[in-house]
């Protein structure tokens, strides 16, 4: 009788251990959490303030989609501010910027190279399409001439 009880106890113990092992092995949220934490979060406030010039870029990111607000207050130039909607690909925000300057509503394309600490505006040849200024070749923009906005 004791042998049967020992065998039954051993089976219960092994079954309990097997179930616990299966639970741990099938728990994938840990893997996805690690993967997501290595991606750069570009959401936040980027700011430049120097020599009477102020540029503020507020970015909200959802996957590859991005939106936010942008304000230019450059010394001795007209202030413009508005909102943008676009996408982030390979650390570059490419978006349509709708803004108001001197009471006139306009739209143009903007590009910023984003890092976890800064944003630099991209420059390149533009053309007007349907009343909106867009980059001729968004993949061939220069970022070395832009002002560096620091992430706050």
Q: Where are the language model's segments positioned?
A:
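N-terminal beta-strand/beta-hairpin edge segment
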Residues: 82-83, 92-94
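Bacterial signal peptide processing site
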Residues: 17-20
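Tryptophan-anchored aromatic micro-motifs
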Residues: 34-53
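A structural detector for short beta-strand units
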Residues: 53-57, 82-84, 108-110
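Sec-dependent bacterial lipoprotein signal peptides
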Residues: 1-15
């Amino acid at each position: 009788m004791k042998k049967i009880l020992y065998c039954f106890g051993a089976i219960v113990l092994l079954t309990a251990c097997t179930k616990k092992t299966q639970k741990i092995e099938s728990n994938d949220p840990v893997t996805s959490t690690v993967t997501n934490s290595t991606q750069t979060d570009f959401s936040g406030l980027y700011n430049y303030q120097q020599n009477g010039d102020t540029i503020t870029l507020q970015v909200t990111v959802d996957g590859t989609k991005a939106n936010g607000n942008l304000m230019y207050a450059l010394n001795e130039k007209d202030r413009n501010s508005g909102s943008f909607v676009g996408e982030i690909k390979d650390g570059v925000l490419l978006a349509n910027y709708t803004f108001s300057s001197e009471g006139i509503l306009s739209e143009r394309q903007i590009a910023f190279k984003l890092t976890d600490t800064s944003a630099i505006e991209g420059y390149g040849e533009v053309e007007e399409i349907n009343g909106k200024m867009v980059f001729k070749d968004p993949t061939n923009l220069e970022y070395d001439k832009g002002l560096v906005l620091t992430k706050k």
